């Protein structure tokens, strides 16, 4: 069977869930994949298969999509080998690991944290902001104080590998492209949709820089009547176009998730004059389980998980 770059490239097994996934026909991301029933999880980037596996395990236990998103993203946040999220994330120009995260549930509630330090799981803090305060976002020292008051512990998130990369960067100031946010969307057995995003942001960014990840409507937007979208890449350009919100609204207007992602990338493309060191990618899902993904440049992959499969799909892109 011929597998094109538009189709699935890998099939894995759900780790830790006790389920051995069968390889089945690949998903064609251009015509979409529709599910009549059952839970589904999608997330940005191939290394996050393990996060999808955990999220699906949570859904199969009967928990809701918000629980699944949080527990799935926690896996990536705690991975010291992931240099763009949580523990092990590359620091800013001052050697500080600062994190951004956001979360939305099927009721339209949202919470986020920005520029938070020393807390390993910002996705969980973002959820508490949503559930325990009247606010949507907390930032910096205030976000950290809130986390500590709610039982989170202060931890050093700078690993030796990340520290060495920062020291090497300080010597020669060579730009390192590293902005691979995890964005996850999940639909549970009750057909309720939630989403979440977590990142350590651009490697060696200016101290104080905040990207799109904690901005509702930029890196994340979910509407339980329509679907949801997440972004990854250079957040400055996502913020300028509110890409995830735009995608969901285009879906509301009748576009498929795939066509809506393409629309958002084309709008971004038209606004740019210099494409050097810039890439943005979007991932979207409708309430029927149809998935779409599109990127400005090549290389973007996403994870697609149901109760019977856990696989990586390669996205199409604009700038061939």
Regions found by a protein language model. Name each.
Residues 2-4, 10-13, 18, 29-320:
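Alpha/propeptide regions of enzymes that mature by internal proteolysis
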Residues 22-26:
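C-terminal segment of classical bacterial N-terminal signal peptides
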